[in-house]
């Protein structure tokens, strides 16, 4: 930690809080995610790190290294100064079809690259897509905590992801192909960019999980009259939002769809993308998998109750103190959200018991 200095707080994510730091020698800005040592360091964290390390693509946040502090595991990664794509949509209300396509093209290229390495993200959403600071922003996929590699693990069965983005087969609690589920989530992302709302939520009752789940299972959505989009775009959405995942459009087919191909930037064409698929492409990280797993293994040991930040300078002590404060706030928020999550689980079970997903 001696080589970094704190710049500012970046907020909280699925597993911990994040901060912006600057490398003291190179002056490079990095994002650092802090995860409390002990019980929070589970297989999801290890999977996120190992999967993330293997990814080398311009539309994916770069993994740099992991660092062990007396109280936390710190994951160091590329900093995307443009913030979340979610914020950009909130500020704009919704995007033009051309702007939505520009970001969708990048999202598809990033997800397709992940799938080529047998890594499914499983929690694709606007909040997990960041932007760099350039005038024509590069989209960067982040947060691989729920991702699952089919090379290392069985097909996913758990219900993970944000309710609004979840595919019907994920709700079924049977084994499903994570690649098909990612395509569905990409479709939800495209819809939100175009419309400024979620496709399967009742705008008058957005927290009604039962209704959202029923609409997902029935593929019940519509494009509002005030949103003017091309027939090609409507066709693509109709091919993505298909209940039977085996009949859903694939990433390979999306990349050949006329709407996707329109104004496709040169760097996103198949010949340009081919360079990233070469297996000999080295990792961005200088840390070996063995070194990372050793550090993660040590992080599973809880922080000592005394002298937790012994040997740290004042800046680092401040970071640890602030991280602890934010985590306390997070725990309070989690307790408040538990009832809603229980309600969500209850409605998922109800949906299973009362209906089978309709055939598409």
Swiss-Prot record:
Enzyme superclass (EC): transferase
Active site: 123
GO MF, one annotated term: kinase activity
Listed Gene3D superfamilies: Phosphorylase Kinase, domain 1, Transferase(Phosphotransferase) domain 1
UniProt-listed InterPro entries: Kinase-like_dom_sf, Prot_kinase_dom, Protein_kinase_ATP_BS, Ser/Thr_kinase_AS
Keyword Repressor: no
Annotated catalysed reactions: L-seryl-[protein] + ATP = O-phospho-L-seryl-[protein] + ADP + H(+); L-threonyl-[protein] + ATP = O-phospho-L-threonyl-[protein] + ADP + H(+)
Sequence ranges of Acidic residues compositional bias: 313-343
Reported induction: By salt and osmotic stress (at protein level).
Protein name as catalogued: Serine/threonine-protein kinase SRK2H
Gene encoding the protein: SRK2H
């Amino acid at each position: 930690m001696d080589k970094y200095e704190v710049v500012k707080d970046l907020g909280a994510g699925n597993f911990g809080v994040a901060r912006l730091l600057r490398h003291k020698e190179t002056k490079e800005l990095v994002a650092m995610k802090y995860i409390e040592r002990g019980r929070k360091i589970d297989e999801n964290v290890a999977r996120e790190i190992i999967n993330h390390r293997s990814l080398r693509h311009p539309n994916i946040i770069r993994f740099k290294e992991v660092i062990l502090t007396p109280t936390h595991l710190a994951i160091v990664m590329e900093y995307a100064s443009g913030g979340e794509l979610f914020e950009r949509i909130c500020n704009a209300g919704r995007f033009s079809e051309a702007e939505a396509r520009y970001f969708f093209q990048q999202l598809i290229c990033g997800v397709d690259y992940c799938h080529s390495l047998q890594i499914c993200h499983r929690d694709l959403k606007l909040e997990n897509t960041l932007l760099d600071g350039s005038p024509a922003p590069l989209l960067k996929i982040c947060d691989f905590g729920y991702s699952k590699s089919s090379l290392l693990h069985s097909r996913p069965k758990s219900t993970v992801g944000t309710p609004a983005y979840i595919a019907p087969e994920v709700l079924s609690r049977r084994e499903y192909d994570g690649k098909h589920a990612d395509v569905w989530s990409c479709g939800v992302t495209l819809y939100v960019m175009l419309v400024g709302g979620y496709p399967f939520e009742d705008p008058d009752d957005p927290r009604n999980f039962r209704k959202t789940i029923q609409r997902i299972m029935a593929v019940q959505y519509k494009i509002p009259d005030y949103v003017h989009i091309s027939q090609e775009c409507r066709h693509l959405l109709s091919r993505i939002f298909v209940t039977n995942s085996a009949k859903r459009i694939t990433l390979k087919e999306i990349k050949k769809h006329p709407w996707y191909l329109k104004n496709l930037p040169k760097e996103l064409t198949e010949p340009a993308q081919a360079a990233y698929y070469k297996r000999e492409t080295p990792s961005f990280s200088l840390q070996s998998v063995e070194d990372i797993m050793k550090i993660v293994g040590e992080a599973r040991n809880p922080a000592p109750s005394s002298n937790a930040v012994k040997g740290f300078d004042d800046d680092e002590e401040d970071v640890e103190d602030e991280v602890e404060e934010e985590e306390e706030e997070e725990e309070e928020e989690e307790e408040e959200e538990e009832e809603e999550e229980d309600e969500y689980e209850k409605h998922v079970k109800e949906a299973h018991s009362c209906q089978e997903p309709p055939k598409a």
